[in-house]
Structures are given as structure tokens and as C-alpha cells.
Design a protein with these regions (language model features):
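Alpha-helical segments in soluble extracytoplasmic regions
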Residues: 50-68
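Short, solvent-exposed, charged loop/turn and helix-capping segments
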Residues: 67-84
Length: 133
């Protein structure tokens, strides 16, 4: 029977590739890189260095958001959000801090520290859910 006429089989997965490997450390490493760019630029007057640092800071900020979104949309499920009612707000605040209103718009390492703090709060909840699983 041609594949087109074969019966449809419904499958589901919690992510694009159901690997089950999640860790907020990925977001944290990228946020640490953002903070390092901010700190190093403060000590350097070379315009080429600053341009490279800006590009890296933008890219790493996007990666922070990506890793947070994967956790938010693929790992955490409705029971987690019920048990931790502030979880959606934490993700919203963290992704905004990694965006145009946060690390992308600022060279202040304190903004990166706020982002790292939100990631740490998310990580604490993440590891609690892993223990319960």
C-alpha cells in the first residue's frame, strides 16, 4: 500500500526530539557569557572589541531566551504550573530580562545579575520537580 494511503498513526512528544534532556544550566551559562561581555566592555576602549562584544551579547541573550523557552514550553507541564503558581511569571520576567528591555538594551552587569537570579529561581523549581519525578 502506498505510504499516502497508509493509516495515520498519532504520536506525541514533549519536544521536537523526545530526548528528555533538560537543564537550566544551559540558560545560566549563556547569561554568564552576557555578563562577561558587559564587564569586559567596561574595561576596553577598542571600538572593534566593543562591536564584537555587542554581537556576542545579543547572540547569547537570544540563546538564554531559547533555553528558557524550551524549559517553559517543553519540560514544564500543567501540574508544575499548578504546584508553582509563580512559574509563568518567573519565565516571563526572565525572558524579558534577556530581551530588548534587559540585557540587549543594557551594558550594566546588574541587569545580567537580575537575569541570573531569575534563572536560579527557575532552576530551583526545576530540580524540585526532577526529585519528585
Amino acid at each position: 500500500m502506498p505510504r499516502v494511503l497508509a493509516p495515520t498513526v498519532l504520536i506525541s512528544a514533549h519536544c521536537d526530539l523526545p530526548c528528555g534532556v533538560y537543564d537550566p544550566a544551559q540558560a545560566r551559562l549563556e547569561a554568564e557569557s552576557v555578563k562577561a561581555c558587559m564587564t569586559k566592555v567596561a574595561d576596553n576602549d577598542d571600538p572593534d572589541f566593543k562591536a564584537r562584544a555587542l554581537a556576542i551579547k545579543e547572540e547569547r541573550s537570544d540563546l538564554v531566551k531559547h533555553h528558557l523557552w524550551v524549559l517553559w514550553t517543553d519540560y514544564f507541564k500543567p501540574p508544575h504550573f499548578a504546584k508553582y503558581p509563580n512559574l509563568n511569571e518567573l519565565f516571563n520576567e526572565a525572558t524579558k530580562l534577556a530581551g530588548a528591555g534587559g540585557t540587549k538594551a543594557s551594558w550594566d552587569p546588574k541587569v545580567a545579575d537580575k537575569l541570573l537570579g531569575k534563572i536560579d529561581e527557575i532552576a530551583e523549581i526545576f530540580w524540585e520537580t526532577k526529585k519528585a519525578a
